[in-house]
Amino acid sequence: MVHFKNCPDPSLNANSQSHPEFSSELEHIKTRMQNFIKHSVTDQNIEVTDARVTAEGEVTSLLKERLDKEYYRLLSKITREVNVADFGAVPDGRDNTEAFRKAIGNGRVKVHVPAGEYLVQGIKLPSWTTIVGQGKGITVIKLHEDTPAHEWVITNDDYQNGNRNIFVQGMSLDWNPSRQCGVRNPGGQFSSCLTFAKVEYGWIKDVEAINAGLHGIDITSPTYDHLPDTDWTKDGSRYIWIDNCVTYGSGDDGITTHYSEYIFISNCHSGNPRGTEFAEGVSNSNGIEIDDGSRHVWLLNNFTSGNIRGVEVKAHELWPASQNVHIIGHISYRDVRAFDLRHIGHHQITDPESTTAYDVTLIDCSAVEPVFNSLYDAVTPRALVISAYKNVNVSGFTAIGDPDYDYKENPVVALQYRSQNITINGIKIRGFKKAGVDINLSGGSNKTDYIKISNFDIYKSAPKGISIGGGLYNVNILNGTMITDNGTVAIQSPNNQATILGVQSEGYSVAASIKGQTYQQVPINLKGGIQLATTSGFAVNQTSAVIAGTGDITARGERNAVISSSGGSSTEGSRALIASSNNAHIRGNQASRTILSSENIILEEPYTVAGGHQSIKWLLDSVRGNGTFAGAISSSLGGYGEYFESSTGQLIHTGTIVTLRGEKIVPANVGDYMLGVISETSAFISGASSFVWQGRYLTNEFGGFIYETVTDEESGELIRVPKQNPDYDTALEANYHSRAARDEWHVVGLVGQHYVRIDETVNQGDYLTAHNGIGTKATEGSWKVMKITSAYTSEKGYGIALTVIK
């Protein structure tokens, strides 16, 4: 027994040509199609243009206009207009096959079929034939009880040579699978309600296809065996328009195309297949399927529901994928996968790459509440899936989920399996609360690649917004809003290669997780050479930048930047920076060089920072820690000092005069060599070992560094660096403290002006000697008091004098 699943009411699809708004709608569709085709820019433009030229050489502006002209040619070729009832057709349960055959004859005829249900064993239409009923559900043509399982309800009569100019309108076609106690398609491309095979110029309008053994409507080639390296549409159908049709209960797909081209499918409904073409639980029965070898196909304002896939653009492993397919204004309601693009057998890295899966657009399409379906248990709900296809454009896509439906953490949109060059603009997603992620970009060896997502809105949907897979480095995410409740992460990527700009998020625990780093605001992440606020700059490398400059400034190398500069300033090599300079240049393939605030200089040495006017005037050497200056070094402080360690390991107070005990210092007494004074005002200080342990690098017998030549890991250049002491323990580096932070080390002022502790004997102009580290009056010497800055008091036990040491 055949079970009908929510068959649509035929009255919903009644002929609407009598309504004035219908004409307006057709004009709107025509304008959209015309603009779309005229302004399309694909490699197949020439072929599409040729398709708009009639057999008489007349150029039409639109392929549909050529179809219209061919329709009028069909009317002009008709020499008879008959009613099938005049040939004995009666809707009373008898076999009317012969009556239809006689009425149709050899073609060039318009056959009218009155209201009623007519049983036939298949109708074959020759060229130049129009068959017209009274409307869907009013005129019904149904297969007779004795009809073989392989028969169609209607097809063309010459599969070998092909047919042309056939028009079918205004009827329901019932394949009657319950005949003979239940029949199914015996295999092959038989058993459909209506098939055009090798037909040029065909029209199918206002037709209802019911319970087909295979497909409701099939636009095809006589055979399905054309390889990708052949002219695979040579024997297919072309210039076909399917309009305002309904299919349901199909054994496989509702409306499908194979090895055919220039097909229009508009204003149609296809849903609720029976799936009997497959084993139970694995029925890939789809609403509209643009299958093997189809190309130049337009789907306009159609509706699908209850299918495994609402619209599938695909091919099987051995056959060419459908190309140049345009889906406009389609609504998928409760199909499992609303829109699915794939080339089977070309998904894994071990599979051959598809050479034919190209050029699909989806414009203003909607996926509403995709759901699981027992027809195919293993297929999980998605709004959009793209696999293996390249050059795909999705614009104005809307995905609406049921917040209470369990999507079992599956993604809403999945780009996967070696798909590439995909643009998604203006996508809106909401309501998939129990999905796993709204947009999933698969990584790994079978990754998708070169993805652009822009002007998108995700609202109260999955816990994750956009997930980027590993090894995926070419993703642009621009201008989006992501708002949800109790979300986990808005954008997730295992690397920082995605370009992210202008994205806002709300309601996620983490706005972004990029290479393990989490953000509470979605960051701006830009890659590629950037030219910003410059009238004439060049960022040559993908990791270089020129910013706020003029005069053909150029950043050539990796991680190079030229900022606030002019006069043709340029960088080369790796990790180079020029800032606030004119006509400054970093040259060669060395690494880590910087020019600041300079005019007309050239820097070549690695690991240096330099500046100057007309020539380098100062240079800092990061390898050796040296600084070189052509001019003076100024300080508000006075004197020169060096670090010395106290012999006791204890702090010696500022202003104390010290002497040497071996290599360490103690407070000086009368007769001691006065080394210097503990100072806090030395302008120049040496011996600090500020950054690393003083013994980290090997030295020669005179204390100079021992050098070695090593290869820079990044640039490959040979550089000369101090040789590390084999006894150096890097594990202790974290606990190392500069001498400035340790009590036992002191800055000892050796020459210049310093503050010295003095006793009550000292006056301005006196010489000093030392007693227990405190200055006392001497008759001569090299220490002379310039002025008393703090008079001696017995309470403190000292005064303070500014003293010059020579």
UniProtKB/Swiss-Prot annotation:
Coiled-coil ranges (or none): none
Stretches forming PbH1 repeats: 199-221, 237-259, 260-292, 294-315, 419-441, 448-470
Keywords: Repeat
A Pfam family matched in the record: Peptidase_G2
Keyword Ligase in annotation: no
Residue ranges with Polar residues bias: 12-21
Region spans: Disordered: 1-23
Disulfide bonds: none
InterPro entries noted in UniProt: GH28_Enzymes, PbH1, Pectin_lyas_fold, Pectin_lyase_fold/virulence, Peptidase_G2
Full protein name: Putative phage-related protein YobO
Organism, scientific name: Bacillus subtilis (strain 168)
